[in-house]
Protein backbone atom coordinates (compact mmCIF):
# COMPACT_ATOMS: atom_id res chain seq x y z
CA UNK A 1 0.00 0.00 0.00
CA UNK A 2 1.39 3.37 -0.96
CA UNK A 3 1.62 6.38 1.33
CA UNK A 4 -1.47 8.07 -0.11
CA UNK A 5 -3.67 5.04 0.59
CA UNK A 6 -3.91 3.75 -2.99
CA UNK A 7 -4.33 -0.02 -3.08
CA UNK A 8 -1.80 -2.13 -4.91
CA UNK A 9 -3.94 -4.38 -7.11
CA UNK A 10 -1.47 -7.20 -6.65
CA UNK A 11 -2.64 -7.40 -3.02
CA UNK A 12 -6.11 -8.45 -4.13
CA UNK A 13 -6.72 -12.16 -4.51
CA UNK A 14 -7.27 -12.59 -8.24
CA UNK A 15 -7.20 -16.39 -8.22
CA UNK A 16 -10.94 -16.44 -7.59
CA UNK A 17 -13.33 -14.75 -10.01
CA UNK A 18 -16.04 -14.41 -7.40
CA UNK A 19 -19.20 -16.48 -6.93
CA UNK A 20 -21.41 -17.80 -9.69
CA UNK A 21 -24.08 -15.27 -10.60
CA UNK A 22 -27.50 -15.70 -12.13
CA UNK A 23 -27.84 -14.19 -15.63
CA UNK A 24 -30.09 -11.37 -14.40
CA UNK A 25 -27.55 -10.51 -11.69
CA UNK A 26 -24.69 -10.31 -14.19
CA UNK A 27 -26.84 -8.16 -16.49
CA UNK A 28 -27.57 -5.79 -13.59
CA UNK A 29 -23.87 -5.49 -12.74
CA UNK A 30 -23.04 -4.66 -16.34
CA UNK A 31 -25.74 -1.97 -16.50
CA UNK A 32 -24.73 -0.43 -13.17
CA UNK A 33 -21.04 -0.43 -14.14
CA UNK A 34 -21.90 1.27 -17.42
CA UNK A 35 -23.83 4.01 -15.61
CA UNK A 36 -21.05 4.55 -13.07
CA UNK A 37 -18.45 4.85 -15.83
CA UNK A 38 -20.56 7.36 -17.74
CA UNK A 39 -21.32 9.64 -14.79
CA UNK A 40 -19.15 12.32 -13.25
CA UNK A 41 -17.65 11.65 -9.82
CA UNK A 42 -20.37 13.48 -7.92
CA UNK A 43 -23.30 11.78 -9.67
CA UNK A 44 -25.22 8.93 -8.09
CA UNK A 45 -27.01 5.81 -9.30
CA UNK A 46 -30.01 4.09 -7.71
CA UNK A 47 -30.53 0.36 -8.35
CA UNK A 48 -33.92 -1.30 -7.87
CA UNK A 49 -34.29 -5.07 -7.41
CA UNK A 50 -37.05 -7.00 -5.59
CA UNK A 51 -36.49 -8.50 -2.16
CA UNK A 52 -35.00 -11.95 -2.70
CA UNK A 53 -33.28 -11.01 -5.96
CA UNK A 54 -29.83 -10.98 -4.38
CA UNK A 55 -29.00 -7.30 -3.94
CA UNK A 56 -26.21 -8.11 -1.47
CA UNK A 57 -24.66 -10.58 -3.91
CA UNK A 58 -24.77 -7.98 -6.68
CA UNK A 59 -23.19 -5.10 -4.79
CA UNK A 60 -20.60 -7.43 -3.24
CA UNK A 61 -19.46 -8.46 -6.72
CA UNK A 62 -19.54 -4.80 -7.80
CA UNK A 63 -17.29 -4.03 -4.83
CA UNK A 64 -14.84 -6.77 -5.80
CA UNK A 65 -14.65 -5.66 -9.43
CA UNK A 66 -14.51 -1.96 -8.57
CA UNK A 67 -11.59 -2.34 -6.17
CA UNK A 68 -9.75 -4.60 -8.57
CA UNK A 69 -10.17 -2.28 -11.57
CA UNK A 70 -9.68 1.13 -9.90
CA UNK A 71 -7.46 0.55 -6.89
CA UNK A 72 -9.89 2.58 -4.76
CA UNK A 73 -11.76 1.51 -1.65
CA UNK A 74 -15.50 0.98 -1.20
CA UNK A 75 -17.69 2.04 1.72
CA UNK A 76 -21.01 0.23 2.28
CA UNK A 77 -23.63 1.85 4.52
CA UNK A 78 -26.37 -0.04 6.38
CA UNK A 79 -28.94 0.94 9.00
CA UNK A 80 -29.21 -2.36 10.89
CA UNK A 81 -26.51 -4.41 12.61
CA UNK A 82 -27.95 -7.59 11.06
CA UNK A 83 -27.45 -6.17 7.57
CA UNK A 84 -23.96 -5.05 8.57
CA UNK A 85 -22.95 -8.58 9.56
CA UNK A 86 -24.60 -10.20 6.54
CA UNK A 87 -22.88 -7.78 4.15
CA UNK A 88 -19.48 -8.32 5.75
CA UNK A 89 -19.92 -12.09 5.51
CA UNK A 90 -20.92 -11.86 1.85
CA UNK A 91 -17.93 -9.63 1.01
CA UNK A 92 -15.65 -12.18 2.66
CA UNK A 93 -17.15 -14.90 0.47
CA UNK A 94 -16.19 -12.71 -2.51
CA UNK A 95 -12.60 -12.47 -1.19
CA UNK A 96 -12.99 -8.81 -0.28
CA UNK A 97 -11.11 -7.93 2.93
CA UNK A 98 -13.48 -5.73 4.90
CA UNK A 99 -13.98 -4.10 8.27
CA UNK A 100 -17.24 -3.52 10.14
CA UNK A 101 -17.63 -0.07 11.67
CA UNK A 102 -20.22 -0.41 14.43
CA UNK A 103 -20.64 1.05 17.91
CA UNK A 104 -17.71 -1.03 19.21
CA UNK A 105 -15.30 0.70 16.82
CA UNK A 106 -14.07 3.96 18.35
CA UNK A 107 -11.52 4.91 15.70
CA UNK A 108 -10.08 3.87 12.33
CA UNK A 109 -6.61 4.94 11.28
CA UNK A 110 -5.54 5.55 7.71
CA UNK A 111 -2.86 2.85 7.80
CA UNK A 112 -5.30 -0.08 7.61
CA UNK A 113 -5.19 -2.88 5.05
CA UNK A 114 -8.91 -3.14 4.37
CA UNK A 115 -10.24 -2.53 0.87
CA UNK A 116 -13.88 -2.21 1.96
CA UNK A 117 -15.75 -0.94 5.00
CA UNK A 118 -19.25 -1.86 6.15
CA UNK A 119 -20.57 0.87 8.43
CA UNK A 120 -23.61 1.50 10.57
CA UNK A 121 -24.94 4.89 9.50
CA UNK A 122 -25.27 6.41 12.98
CA UNK A 123 -21.90 5.13 14.18
CA UNK A 124 -20.07 6.40 11.11
CA UNK A 125 -21.76 9.77 11.33
CA UNK A 126 -20.72 10.14 14.98
CA UNK A 127 -17.12 9.08 14.35
CA UNK A 128 -16.76 11.40 11.37
CA UNK A 129 -18.10 14.31 13.42
CA UNK A 130 -15.65 13.43 16.18
CA UNK A 131 -12.86 13.14 13.56
CA UNK A 132 -11.93 9.72 14.94
CA UNK A 133 -12.19 7.95 11.60
CA UNK A 134 -10.08 8.54 8.50
CA UNK A 135 -11.38 7.02 5.28
CA UNK A 136 -9.11 8.07 2.44
CA UNK A 137 -9.20 6.82 -1.14
CA UNK A 138 -12.92 5.94 -1.04
CA UNK A 139 -14.05 5.79 -4.66
CA UNK A 140 -17.52 4.31 -4.28
CA UNK A 141 -20.16 4.47 -1.54
CA UNK A 142 -22.91 1.82 -1.60
CA UNK A 143 -26.10 2.48 0.37
CA UNK A 144 -28.14 -0.60 1.27
CA UNK A 145 -31.91 -0.07 1.77
CA UNK A 146 -31.39 3.36 0.21
CA UNK A 147 -35.03 4.43 0.58
CA UNK A 148 -34.37 5.20 4.26
CA UNK A 149 -33.56 8.87 4.80
CA UNK A 150 -31.07 8.38 7.63
CA UNK A 151 -28.26 7.97 5.08
CA UNK A 152 -28.59 11.50 3.70
CA UNK A 153 -26.65 13.01 6.61
CA UNK A 154 -23.50 11.22 5.40
CA UNK A 155 -23.61 12.33 1.77
CA UNK A 156 -21.85 15.63 2.58
CA UNK A 157 -18.71 13.69 3.51
CA UNK A 158 -18.55 11.99 0.10
CA UNK A 159 -19.46 14.72 -2.37
CA UNK A 160 -16.64 13.87 -4.80
CA UNK A 161 -17.34 10.14 -5.17
CA UNK A 162 -20.06 8.09 -6.84
CA UNK A 163 -22.84 6.78 -4.63
CA UNK A 164 -24.76 3.62 -5.52
CA UNK A 165 -28.07 3.26 -3.71
CA UNK A 166 -29.72 -0.16 -3.58
CA UNK A 167 -33.39 -0.75 -2.78
CA UNK A 168 -36.41 -2.88 -3.64
CA UNK A 169 -38.58 0.24 -3.84
CA UNK A 170 -37.14 3.55 -5.15
CA UNK A 171 -39.61 5.54 -3.09
CA UNK A 172 -38.34 7.61 -0.16
CA UNK A 173 -39.57 6.86 3.35
CA UNK A 174 -40.47 10.57 3.50
CA UNK A 175 -42.61 12.29 0.87
CA UNK A 176 -40.77 15.54 1.66
CA UNK A 177 -37.38 14.05 0.69
CA UNK A 178 -37.76 12.36 -2.72
CA UNK A 179 -34.94 10.09 -3.84
CA UNK A 180 -34.42 11.95 -7.11
CA UNK A 181 -32.88 14.76 -5.06
CA UNK A 182 -29.84 12.58 -4.34
CA UNK A 183 -29.77 10.12 -7.24
CA UNK A 184 -29.53 11.15 -10.88
CA UNK A 185 -29.96 7.74 -12.54
CA UNK A 186 -32.25 4.77 -11.90
CA UNK A 187 -31.33 1.24 -12.97
CA UNK A 188 -34.25 -1.19 -12.80
CA UNK A 189 -33.52 -4.86 -12.29
CA UNK A 190 -35.60 -7.95 -12.99
CA UNK A 191 -39.27 -7.65 -12.03
CA UNK A 192 -40.95 -9.78 -9.38
CA UNK A 193 -43.15 -11.54 -11.94
CA UNK A 194 -40.12 -12.37 -14.08
CA UNK A 195 -38.19 -13.76 -11.09
CA UNK A 196 -41.24 -15.84 -10.15
CA UNK A 197 -41.71 -17.18 -13.69
CA UNK A 198 -38.02 -18.14 -13.83
CA UNK A 199 -38.31 -19.90 -10.44
CA UNK A 200 -35.96 -17.52 -8.61
CA UNK A 201 -38.81 -16.47 -6.29
CA UNK A 202 -41.85 -18.33 -4.96
CA UNK A 203 -45.30 -17.63 -6.35
CA UNK A 204 -47.68 -15.87 -3.95
CA UNK A 205 -51.38 -16.55 -3.44
CA UNK A 206 -53.03 -13.62 -1.69
CA UNK A 207 -56.13 -13.72 0.50
CA UNK A 208 -57.56 -10.34 1.45
CA UNK A 209 -59.98 -9.90 4.35
CA UNK A 210 -61.83 -6.59 4.27
CA UNK A 211 -61.22 -4.40 7.31
CA UNK A 212 -62.75 -1.03 8.23
CA UNK A 213 -59.84 1.35 8.84
CA UNK A 214 -61.83 4.50 9.60
CA UNK A 215 -60.38 4.71 13.14
CA UNK A 216 -56.75 4.74 11.94
CA UNK A 217 -54.80 8.00 12.04
CA UNK A 218 -51.93 9.00 9.72
CA UNK A 219 -48.79 10.31 11.46
CA UNK A 220 -46.18 12.84 10.34
CA UNK A 221 -44.21 10.07 8.62
CA UNK A 222 -47.16 9.45 6.29
CA UNK A 223 -48.06 6.04 7.71
CA UNK A 224 -50.67 4.91 10.21
CA UNK A 225 -49.79 5.65 13.83
CA UNK A 226 -48.92 2.86 16.23
CA UNK A 227 -51.46 4.14 18.77
CA UNK A 228 -54.44 4.04 16.41
CA UNK A 229 -53.28 0.68 15.00
CA UNK A 230 -53.06 -0.78 18.50
CA UNK A 231 -56.62 0.34 19.23
CA UNK A 232 -57.95 -1.33 16.09
CA UNK A 233 -55.89 -4.51 15.90
CA UNK A 234 -55.78 -5.08 19.64
CA UNK A 235 -59.53 -5.47 20.02
CA UNK A 236 -61.21 -8.84 20.39
CA UNK A 237 -63.01 -8.77 17.04
CA UNK A 238 -59.79 -8.25 15.07
CA UNK A 239 -57.90 -10.90 17.07
CA UNK A 240 -60.76 -13.31 16.35
CA UNK A 241 -60.67 -12.38 12.66
CA UNK A 242 -56.92 -13.04 12.56
CA UNK A 243 -57.25 -16.51 14.07
CA UNK A 244 -60.11 -17.34 11.71
CA UNK A 245 -58.07 -16.22 8.71
CA UNK A 246 -55.13 -18.33 9.87
CA UNK A 247 -57.31 -21.40 10.37
CA UNK A 248 -58.98 -20.95 6.98
CA UNK A 249 -55.86 -20.33 4.89
CA UNK A 250 -52.71 -21.26 6.81
CA UNK A 251 -53.36 -23.80 9.54
CA UNK A 252 -50.37 -26.11 10.00
CA UNK A 253 -48.05 -23.91 7.90
CA UNK A 254 -45.00 -21.99 9.07
CA UNK A 255 -46.40 -18.48 9.50
CA UNK A 256 -44.86 -15.05 10.04
CA UNK A 257 -47.19 -12.31 11.35
CA UNK A 258 -46.39 -8.59 11.04
CA UNK A 259 -48.00 -6.11 13.44
CA UNK A 260 -47.78 -2.34 13.99
CA UNK A 261 -47.47 -2.38 17.76
CA UNK A 262 -45.92 -4.42 20.57
CA UNK A 263 -49.17 -4.64 22.55
CA UNK A 264 -50.94 -5.99 19.47
CA UNK A 265 -48.25 -8.62 18.95
CA UNK A 266 -48.46 -9.74 22.58
CA UNK A 267 -52.23 -9.96 22.14
CA UNK A 268 -51.72 -12.13 19.06
CA UNK A 269 -49.36 -14.34 21.07
CA UNK A 270 -51.87 -14.76 23.90
CA UNK A 271 -54.79 -15.43 21.53
CA UNK A 272 -52.99 -18.12 19.53
CA UNK A 273 -51.47 -19.66 22.65
CA UNK A 274 -54.91 -19.95 24.23
CA UNK A 275 -56.13 -21.66 21.05
CA UNK A 276 -53.39 -24.29 21.43
CA UNK A 277 -50.97 -23.14 18.71
CA UNK A 278 -47.15 -23.07 18.85
CA UNK A 279 -46.24 -19.38 18.74
CA UNK A 280 -43.48 -16.97 19.79
CA UNK A 281 -43.28 -13.17 19.94
CA UNK A 282 -40.35 -11.04 18.76
CA UNK A 283 -39.64 -7.30 18.95
CA UNK A 284 -36.58 -5.04 19.32
CA UNK A 285 -36.65 -5.32 23.14
CA UNK A 286 -35.81 -9.03 23.01
CA UNK A 287 -32.16 -9.77 23.87
CA UNK A 288 -29.82 -10.93 21.12
CA UNK A 289 -29.45 -14.35 22.73
CA UNK A 290 -33.20 -14.85 23.09
CA UNK A 291 -33.73 -13.64 19.55
CA UNK A 292 -31.30 -16.25 18.22
CA UNK A 293 -33.11 -18.95 20.18
CA UNK A 294 -36.54 -17.86 18.90
CA UNK A 295 -35.36 -17.72 15.27
CA UNK A 296 -33.74 -21.15 15.63
CA UNK A 297 -37.02 -22.50 17.04
CA UNK A 298 -38.89 -20.90 14.13
CA UNK A 299 -36.50 -22.48 11.64
CA UNK A 300 -36.76 -25.97 13.12
CA UNK A 301 -40.51 -26.08 13.87
CA UNK A 302 -42.61 -26.99 10.79
CA UNK A 303 -45.89 -25.40 11.95
CA UNK A 304 -44.36 -22.52 13.92
CA UNK A 305 -46.10 -19.15 14.19
CA UNK A 306 -43.95 -16.06 14.83
CA UNK A 307 -45.62 -12.75 15.64
CA UNK A 308 -43.37 -9.72 15.29
CA UNK A 309 -43.10 -5.93 15.29
CA UNK A 310 -40.81 -4.18 12.81
CA UNK A 311 -37.69 -6.20 13.51
CA UNK A 312 -37.99 -8.79 10.71
CA UNK A 313 -38.75 -6.53 7.74
CA UNK A 314 -35.04 -6.34 6.80
CA UNK A 315 -31.99 -8.46 7.58
CA UNK A 316 -34.04 -11.63 8.08
CA UNK A 317 -34.01 -14.60 5.77
CA UNK A 318 -35.89 -17.82 6.53
CA UNK A 319 -36.68 -19.62 3.25
CA UNK A 320 -39.06 -22.12 4.90
CA UNK A 321 -41.72 -19.47 5.68
CA UNK A 322 -44.97 -20.60 4.03
CA UNK A 323 -47.39 -17.82 4.99
CA UNK A 324 -47.07 -14.09 5.58
CA UNK A 325 -49.88 -12.43 7.54
CA UNK A 326 -50.14 -8.64 7.33
CA UNK A 327 -51.95 -7.98 10.60
CA UNK A 328 -51.63 -4.27 9.98
CA UNK A 329 -52.31 -1.58 7.43
CA UNK A 330 -49.54 0.48 5.88
CA UNK A 331 -49.26 3.33 3.40
CA UNK A 332 -45.61 2.46 2.71
CA UNK A 333 -45.02 0.63 -0.56
CA UNK A 334 -41.51 -0.26 0.62
CA UNK A 335 -42.81 -1.88 3.81
CA UNK A 336 -45.50 -3.75 1.87
CA UNK A 337 -42.88 -5.31 -0.40
CA UNK A 338 -40.46 -5.97 2.45
CA UNK A 339 -43.03 -7.85 4.52
CA UNK A 340 -44.29 -10.03 1.69
CA UNK A 341 -40.75 -10.58 0.42
CA UNK A 342 -39.92 -12.45 3.62
CA UNK A 343 -41.95 -15.38 2.29
CA UNK A 344 -40.70 -15.33 -1.30
CA UNK A 345 -37.54 -17.42 -0.95
CA UNK A 346 -37.46 -20.63 -3.00
CA UNK A 347 -36.36 -24.01 -1.64
CA UNK A 348 -36.25 -27.50 -3.14
CA UNK A 349 -39.65 -28.22 -1.60
CA UNK A 350 -41.24 -24.75 -1.62
CA UNK A 351 -42.23 -22.94 -4.81
CA UNK A 352 -45.33 -21.12 -3.50
CA UNK A 353 -46.39 -19.22 -0.41
CA UNK A 354 -49.50 -17.50 0.93
CA UNK A 355 -50.19 -13.90 1.89
CA UNK A 356 -53.07 -13.08 4.24
CA UNK A 357 -53.89 -9.38 4.18
CA UNK A 358 -55.81 -7.88 7.10
CA UNK A 359 -55.08 -4.24 6.31
CA UNK A 360 -56.62 -3.60 2.87
CA UNK A 361 -53.04 -3.39 1.57
CA UNK A 362 -53.87 -5.41 -1.54
CA UNK A 363 -56.53 -2.87 -2.48
CA UNK A 364 -54.08 -0.02 -1.84
CA UNK A 365 -50.98 -1.29 -3.67
CA UNK A 366 -52.15 -4.17 -5.84
CA UNK A 367 -50.73 -7.67 -5.91
CA UNK A 368 -47.12 -8.10 -4.77
CA UNK A 369 -46.03 -9.36 -8.19
CA UNK A 370 -48.08 -6.89 -10.26
CA UNK A 371 -46.18 -4.64 -12.72
CA UNK A 372 -44.94 -1.37 -11.19
CA UNK A 373 -43.75 1.69 -13.11
CA UNK A 374 -40.67 2.36 -11.00
CA UNK A 375 -39.44 5.12 -13.32
CA UNK A 376 -42.67 7.05 -12.75
CA UNK A 377 -42.49 6.53 -8.99
CA UNK A 378 -38.84 7.67 -8.93
CA UNK A 379 -39.45 10.74 -11.08
CA UNK A 380 -42.87 11.78 -9.71
CA UNK A 381 -43.28 10.43 -6.16
CA UNK A 382 -45.79 13.12 -5.18
CA UNK A 383 -48.09 12.06 -8.00
CA UNK A 384 -47.79 8.44 -6.92
CA UNK A 385 -48.89 9.34 -3.38
CA UNK A 386 -51.72 11.49 -4.73
CA UNK A 387 -52.96 8.57 -6.84
CA UNK A 388 -53.08 6.12 -3.91
CA UNK A 389 -56.64 5.08 -3.12
CA UNK A 390 -57.98 6.52 0.10
CA UNK A 391 -59.36 4.17 2.74
CA UNK A 392 -62.82 5.60 2.13
CA UNK A 393 -62.68 4.78 -1.59
CA UNK A 394 -61.33 1.29 -0.88
CA UNK A 395 -64.05 0.49 1.62
CA UNK A 396 -66.81 1.71 -0.70
CA UNK A 397 -65.74 -1.03 -3.11
CA UNK A 398 -65.94 -3.83 -0.55
CA UNK A 399 -68.16 -6.79 -1.36
CA UNK A 400 -68.92 -9.05 1.56
CA UNK A 401 -67.44 -12.56 1.32
CA UNK A 402 -68.98 -15.16 3.58
CA UNK A 403 -66.39 -17.13 5.61
CA UNK A 404 -66.00 -20.78 4.62
CA UNK A 405 -67.26 -22.13 7.96
CA UNK A 406 -70.40 -19.97 7.74
CA UNK A 407 -70.97 -20.86 4.08
CA UNK A 408 -71.22 -24.52 5.09
CA UNK A 409 -74.23 -23.67 7.26
CA UNK A 410 -75.97 -22.31 4.14
CA UNK A 411 -74.78 -25.07 1.81
CA UNK A 412 -78.29 -25.71 0.44
CA UNK A 413 -78.50 -22.17 -0.97
CA UNK A 414 -77.03 -21.77 -4.44
CA UNK A 415 -77.12 -17.97 -4.46
CA UNK A 416 -76.00 -16.06 -1.37
CA UNK A 417 -74.77 -12.86 -3.04
CA UNK A 418 -76.62 -9.58 -3.33
CA UNK A 419 -74.70 -6.54 -4.55
CA UNK A 420 -76.40 -3.80 -2.53
CA UNK A 421 -74.63 -0.99 -4.37
CA UNK A 422 -75.64 -2.33 -7.79
CA UNK A 423 -79.21 -2.96 -6.61
CA UNK A 424 -79.41 0.55 -5.17
CA UNK A 425 -78.17 2.15 -8.41
CA UNK A 426 -80.64 0.04 -10.38
CA UNK A 427 -83.53 1.07 -8.12
CA UNK A 428 -82.61 4.74 -8.43
CA UNK A 429 -82.45 4.47 -12.23
CA UNK A 430 -86.03 3.16 -12.18
CA UNK A 431 -87.19 5.89 -9.84
CA UNK A 432 -87.86 3.42 -7.04
CA UNK A 433 -87.52 4.02 -3.30
CA UNK A 434 -84.39 2.77 -1.48
CA UNK A 435 -86.66 0.58 0.68
CA UNK A 436 -87.00 -1.70 -2.36
CA UNK A 437 -83.35 -2.69 -1.94
CA UNK A 438 -83.77 -3.34 1.79
CA UNK A 439 -86.77 -5.54 1.04
CA UNK A 440 -84.74 -7.56 -1.49
CA UNK A 441 -81.99 -8.08 1.08
CA UNK A 442 -84.47 -9.25 3.72
CA UNK A 443 -86.14 -11.59 1.23
CA UNK A 444 -82.79 -13.11 0.29
CA UNK A 445 -81.76 -13.70 3.92
CA UNK A 446 -85.16 -15.17 4.75
CA UNK A 447 -84.91 -17.53 1.79
CA UNK A 448 -81.42 -18.65 2.86
CA UNK A 449 -82.54 -19.35 6.43
CA UNK A 450 -85.62 -21.31 5.29
CA UNK A 451 -83.62 -23.38 2.80
CA UNK A 452 -81.09 -24.47 5.43
CA UNK A 453 -83.24 -24.85 8.57
CA UNK A 454 -85.24 -27.82 9.85
CA UNK A 455 -87.61 -25.68 11.90
CA UNK A 456 -88.33 -22.11 12.97
CA UNK A 457 -85.76 -22.19 15.79
CA UNK A 458 -83.03 -23.28 13.41
CA UNK A 459 -84.02 -20.47 11.06
CA UNK A 460 -83.76 -17.90 13.86
CA UNK A 461 -80.31 -19.18 14.84
CA UNK A 462 -79.17 -18.96 11.22
CA UNK A 463 -80.50 -15.41 10.99
CA UNK A 464 -78.25 -14.42 13.90
CA UNK A 465 -75.27 -15.89 12.05
CA UNK A 466 -75.88 -13.39 9.23
CA UNK A 467 -75.23 -10.30 11.38
CA UNK A 468 -71.84 -9.65 9.70
CA UNK A 469 -73.42 -10.04 6.28
CA UNK A 470 -76.04 -7.45 7.20
CA UNK A 471 -73.47 -5.00 8.64
CA UNK A 472 -71.10 -5.26 5.68
Q: What do the predicted segments below correspond to?
A:
Residues 39-62:
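Walker A/P-loop
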Residues 57-58, 67-93, 262:
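Conserved Walker A/P-loop ATP-binding site and its immediately adjacent core
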Residues 85, 100-111, 129, 266-270, ...:
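Conserved helicase ATPase core of P-loop NTP-dependent helicases/translocases
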Residues 105-137, 148, 152:
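Conserved helix/coil segment N-terminal to the catalytic DExD/H
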Residues 122, 140, 284-378:
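Conserved RecA-like P-loop NTPase helicase motor core
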Residues 147-206:
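Post-DEXD/H (motif II) to motif III coupling segment of the RecA-like Helicase ATP-binding lobe
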Residues 185-259:
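Conserved interdomain linker/interface between the two RecA-like ATPase lobes of SF2 helicase motors
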Residues 300, 334, 344-461:
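C-terminal helicase lobe
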Amino acid sequence: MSENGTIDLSEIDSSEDGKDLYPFQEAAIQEISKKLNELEDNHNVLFQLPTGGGKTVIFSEITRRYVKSTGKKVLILTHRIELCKQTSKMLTEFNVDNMIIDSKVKSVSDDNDYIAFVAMVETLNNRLQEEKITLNNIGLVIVDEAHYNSFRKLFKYFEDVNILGVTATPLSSSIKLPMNQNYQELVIGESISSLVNKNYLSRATTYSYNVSLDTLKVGINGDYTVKSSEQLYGNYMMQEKLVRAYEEKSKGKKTLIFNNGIATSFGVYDTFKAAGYEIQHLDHHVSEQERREILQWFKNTPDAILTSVGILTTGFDEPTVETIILNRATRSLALYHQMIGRGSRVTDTKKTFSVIDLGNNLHRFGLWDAPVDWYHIFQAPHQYYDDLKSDEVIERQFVYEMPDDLRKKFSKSENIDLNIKAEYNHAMSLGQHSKVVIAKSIDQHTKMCVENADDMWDALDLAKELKDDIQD
